[in-house]
UniProtKB/Swiss-Prot annotation:
PANTHER family in the record: NADH DEHYDROGENASE [UBIQUINONE] IRON-SULFUR PROTEIN 3, MITOCHONDRIAL, NADH DEHYDROGENASE UBIQUINONE IRON-SULFUR PROTEIN 3
Protein name, per record: NADH-quinone oxidoreductase subunit C
GO CC terms, sorted: plasma membrane
Membrane association type: Peripheral membrane protein
Species assigned in the record: Albidiferax ferrireducens (strain ATCC BAA-621 / DSM 15236 / T118) (Rhodoferax ferrireducens)
Subcellular location as annotated: Cell inner membrane
Keywords: Cell inner membrane, Cell membrane, Membrane, NAD, Quinone, Translocase, Transport, Ubiquinone
Length: 202
């Protein structure tokens, strides 16, 4: 059985008290606390989680985007894009997951956390690049994983697996060129081996 330096239920009580009315929901599942705040109060909530003496989440460990358009194979019922941050308190040995949903699915915008935790910089650039989530107040919001000529955001669930364009080296032009994707769309079905014990491999 896992023993915790701080009881997860105590973390929930402290975080709920610190955030107060800024909190939309707070769920403790598998001894991990997830809190959801409104986009209008995202930056304020982050500062409270960093500065409150019972929270003291000094470090942002990770930040990513999520596309909920087909979550659990169900049609979308709420907002589509979410930003999820994982925060760590080194001094109190506790963690929390902070979630905020972008209020507009057509142009997802949330506030940048770079002024609260500088480690958010490249994480936010990655979420912008892969999901198209715009971080308001980010000083250098540009692509970080795809090239600067890339069209679209490849982690969105409506982005085609094959992409839109491909690159190849053109010997005549002596440079890399873009061209429309040349592979045909296809449905990929996993191979199933029906022999007993996988053909005697086990």
């Amino acid at each position: 059985m896992t023993s915790y330096a701080v009881n997860p239920q105590s973390i929930k009580v402290h975080v709920e008290a610190a955030l107060g009315d800024l909190l939309i929901s707070s769920v403790l599942r598998l001894d991990e606390l997830t809190v959801v705040v409104d986009g209008a109060h995202y930056l304020q909530a982050a500062k409270i989680l960093r500065d409150d003496p019972n929270c003291r989440f000094e470090q942002l460990m990770d930040l990513c985007g999520v596309d909920y358009s087909t979550y659990k194979d169900q049609p979308q019922t709420g907002l589509r894009y979410c930003v999820v941050s994982h925060l760590l308190s080194v001094s109190l040995n506790q963690r929390v997951r902070l979630k905020v949903f972008a209020p507009d699915d057509n142009l997802p915008v949330v506030q940048s956390l770079c002024d609260v935790w500088s480690s958010a910089n490249w994480f936010e650039r990655e979420a912008f690049d892969l999901f198209g989530i715009v971080f308001e107040g980010h000083a250098d919001l540009r692509r970080i994983l795809t090239d600067y000529g890339f069209v679209g955001h490849p982690f969105r669930k409506d982005f085609p697996v094959s992409g839109h364009v491909e690159m190849r080296y053109d010997a005549e032009l002596k440079r890399v060129v873009y061209q429309p994707v040349t592979i045909e769309p296809r449905e990929i079905t996993p191979r199933i081996i029906r022999e007993d014990n996988y053909g005697g491999l086990h």
